[in-house]
């Protein structure tokens, strides 16, 4: 039986008046009545900064799914009660869901306007884990005290490779760049590992890889980076080496490369956007990863809930043979700025000028299976120009939970919050207090209408905010209230591993 009110410590518990702390046996009936009143009326015994009253609380860790009242003080959940609570402010959440704030492990865009869209999609913590940075200190310093949501970054194999090879730093390397094409010399490999380890010493939460963008990187080089990660108990967040199912380099050999690296080094492997890289082979890719986990290997996987991807048209992904590898053609490519579908001529033009291109590569059935699979967590791969940036969380809740019933609401909340938190907590212990609705957890919360939540962003209008998400709190501070973005607050904090 669950207690009617649970408090963080003895000091928070309802107390009887001091006159009843000593009593005789004949006083028991009266004291029992007063004790019952204290339990039935906890509002008279407890003050909070904020109370979220009467919402349907979903806690994916304990599987609590019940109407509760939450008491928040100093940015932390201090009480989860079946009975009313008293606070300096009370917000009625009746008829709405209260869930842990969503955690996005794959968000590339980290400007204030990007965080605005993330908050309106229920995200309270956003991480750049795939590409990452070569300068961890500078990345965090650029956002200090200025963010709506919590934020974190990996040290990236791509930017560190650019630095080690003396290449011009860009977001992703061009297909003909030395970063993309050249194997690392012994000296460059040593420099690359030094840069990665330095980033981990400065608190990077993971090591990021985009191996498909750096085909010149050997398997030994990747293994060396996994060894560096293992020294710091850091997960490796990886865009795998290849697509397709033919030739020596394919989606299966690429996943096996990471499974082997984890087995040899002990560094956890996290596979990025499996439905985007595996495409029609996604079910078999997930079968491989499930089998690896069943044998005790620490591997995890993410997906996003859209049938199209987006990447740089200049990258090695579009080297000759891309149609066969991905099972698509020119007409499946869409230029975000104009909405046009490409042909041979326009592809050649944009390949020269560069830019991000939308890639329509999956049937809905593949995405649905990926979203619903027990192993996957949800991560947006968020970039401006694609609806996944603004609407991934709401699309899961609206389309895949309510409309198609591919998974339950509790399962969706777990994929959006608890599973991402668990992926990072081995490296960043503070993540143990995120992704949960329990006493002592951070008050990073989302309040939404399960009957109305939906994504509004489209491929033609990719920056439309989600709807049906009424309130979002970051550290107990409203960043979305009554559906309105709160632009004058910056409660977001850096999520960072121990800095040496």
Residue locations for each model-derived region?
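Divalent-metal coordination cores built from histidine and acidic residues
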Residues: 93-98, 112-208, 297, 306
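Conserved N-terminal entry element of GNAT/NAT acetyltransferase domains
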Residues: 1-10
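Active-site microenvironment of metallo-dependent hydrolases
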Residues: 33-34, 43-68, 73, 82, ...
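Active-site metal-binding motif and surrounding structural segment of the metallo-beta-lactamase
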Residues: 83-99
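Helix-loop element at the rim of GNAT/NAT acetyltransferase active sites that forms part
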Residues: 19-28
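Metallo-beta-lactamase
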Residues: 101-108
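Divalent metal-binding pocket/active-site signature
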Residues: 189-190, 198-256
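Active-site neighborhoods of metal-dependent hydrolases
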Residues: 161-168, 175-217, 259-263, 267-409
């Amino acid at each position: 039986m669950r207690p009617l009110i649970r408090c963080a410590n003895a000091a928070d518990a309802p107390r009887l008046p001091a006159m009843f702390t000593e009593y005789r046996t004949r006083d028991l009936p009266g004291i029992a009545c007063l004790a019952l009143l204290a339990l039935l009326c906890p509002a008279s015994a407890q003050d909070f900064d904020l109370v979220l009253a009467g919402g349907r609380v979903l806690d994916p860790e304990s599987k609590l799914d019940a109407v509760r009242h939450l008491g928040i003080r100093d940015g932390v959940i201090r009480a989860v009660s079946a009975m009313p609570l008293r606070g300096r402010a009370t917000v009625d959440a009746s008829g709405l869901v209260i869930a842990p704030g969503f955690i996005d492990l794959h968000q590339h865009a980290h400007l204030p306007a990007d965080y605005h869209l993330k908050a309106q999609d229920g995200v309270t913590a956003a991480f750049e884990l795939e590409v990452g940075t070569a300068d961890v200190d500078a990345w965090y310093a650029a956002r200090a005290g200025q963010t709506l949501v919590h934020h974190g970054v990996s040290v990236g194999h791509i930017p560190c490779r650019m630095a080690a090879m003396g290449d011009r730093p860009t977001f992703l390397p061009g297909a003909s760049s030395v970063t993309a094409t050249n194997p690392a010399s012994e000296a460059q490999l040593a420099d690359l590992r030094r840069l990665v380890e330095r980033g981990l010493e400065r608190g990077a939460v993971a090591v990021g890889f985009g191996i498909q963008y750096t085909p010149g990187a050997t398997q030994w080089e990747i293994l060396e980076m996994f060894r560096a990660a293992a020294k710091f108990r850091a997960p490796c967040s990886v865009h795998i080496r290849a697509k397709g199912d033919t030739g020596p380099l394919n989606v299966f050999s690429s996943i096996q490369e990471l499974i082997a690296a984890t087995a040899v080094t002990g560094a956890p492997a996290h596979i990025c956007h499996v439905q985007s890289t595996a495409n029609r082979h996604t079910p078999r890719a997930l079968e491989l990863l499930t089998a690896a986990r069943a044998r005790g290997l620490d591997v995890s996987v993410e997906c996003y809930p859209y049938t199209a991807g987006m990447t740089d048209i200049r990258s090695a992904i579009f080297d000759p043979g891309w149609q066969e590898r991905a099972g698509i053609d020119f007409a499946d490519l869409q230029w975000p700025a104009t909405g046009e579908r490409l042909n041979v001529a326009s592809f050649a033009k944009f390949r020269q000028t560069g830019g991000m291109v939308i890639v329509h590569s999956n049937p809905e059935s593949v995405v649905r299976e990926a979203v619903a699979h027990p192993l996957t967590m949800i991560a947006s791969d968020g970039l401006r120009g694609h609806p996944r940036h603004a609407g991934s969380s709401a699309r899961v809740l609206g389309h895949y939970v309510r409309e198609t019933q591919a998974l339950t609401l509790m399962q969706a909340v777990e994929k959006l919050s608890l599973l991402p938190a668990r992926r990072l907590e081995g490296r960043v212990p503070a993540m143990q207090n995120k992704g949960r609705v329990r006493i002592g957890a951070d008050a990073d919360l989302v309040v939404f209408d399960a009957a109305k939540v939906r994504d509004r962003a489209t491929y033609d209008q990719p920056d439309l905010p989600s709807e049906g998400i009424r309130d979002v709190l970051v550290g107990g501070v409203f960043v979305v209230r009554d559906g309105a973005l709160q632009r004058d607050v910056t409660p977001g904090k850096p999520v960072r591993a121990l800095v040496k």
